[in-house]
Amino acid sequence: MRTVLKARCLLICFGLFVTQPSTSQERDYLVGINPELSYKMLEPNQNVRKVSVLMDERHANNLAARKLMIGTSLIVLADYQKSNTNSKFAYLMRHPTSANQIGTEASEAVIHSFQFSLYGAINSWIATFAEVLYNPEQSFGAGTITSIDRNQLQLYRGFVLLGNLDKFPLYGAIGKMDAPFGLMNSVNPFTNSTMWHAFSGLGYGAQLNFKKYNIHATAMAIQGGAQFRALSTVVGDSTNVPSKLNNFTADLNYTIPFTTSFEFKIGASYLAGSVYNQAFPVKHFNPGVINNPAYTYYAQALVLKKLLIIAAFAKTVKEWPGTYNPSPPLNIYPASKVSSFVAGAKYTFNPESKIAYTVSAEFSNYIAGPDGSPWERQNQYILGFCGLINNSSKFFIEVFGTQGYVPLNFISGSNPNDPFPEGTTHSSNAAASLGVVLGAQVVF
């Protein structure tokens, strides 16, 4: 018994020793939480350019030097969906496969995702950010949402940020980060736009930014091969081995502050290697056979800091080879370029209140085939309402509808009986679904 008591006392003393700084120098290095900043870094769809978000927060003195910040985000939700076609649910906030959604009705009450982040700055020029993600609903692992392969942790983002906008208009980052391509943000409280699913890239690389005179120019050198999302170039003799830094994207946008209550942003981007470069049959992360660039242009307006309006269009430069199925009867449809469009608006009634209420509406689409083809298009409509609590956590409800069912894997069919019969595809331009999702994101 005495041995147990001694051990407990030693543990308590050790805990007090490691948690209490012994010198004034050690007191300068603090560990803490900043829910408002953590929300901006961990929310999944309002502003996905996290390198720029962190730099802007540093510029606004919201992240002091020599402080390590811990952040967490938990998104839980319940939803119900109904489809007019058996086992074809096109809502993309979970992978649309029959492994997880069967029949013509689906419902769930689940954890959508959990994030844990560490970020901080060692001085006025150097900062770092790392985010660990658990997301069985949207994992690329095989099986159902309870399978081991879909219940894994991953370092979703991680980068070192170099720069000080107070002293110099250039800053950069190296690591795993979102590609600065287009407007991948959404006005929805939870759901990402179809534009995001189609063109929002995530990969290893090095980024350089210029920000001054209301101009923001960004260039990113991206590791080649098939990256984590929406980025792919041919490496060597048609492999996807990421052994060369041979992909890049560039973005330029300009913000026009007409008055203190109205600003307008316009921008355009170019991507050297989009993911739409594979031959038939298409499968995630397979090697490409060409480099297929993409371009985008976008705009957004902010009125009275209450009304936000966005619009964007993106398209590949070349046809996607894999959208041509050589087997009849589907061989009547030629290979097609890929494009996406998004338009939306949201209005916040009381942005300065402890609970800010927002209503939103958004349309986005994905065009991957010629008129009449089963993989022609997938449309998404969202109506949303949310309450943002202390600028750090929110509850939300969305009503959504989809038209078309166009998964990327085997979008135009497969080799005979691998897994589909010859001349068939699981894509459908007639499939449609309706649903409602309610949930909460709690951030510390």
Regions flagged by a language model, labelled:
Residues A226-P281, I290:
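Loop-centered beta-sheet repeat module
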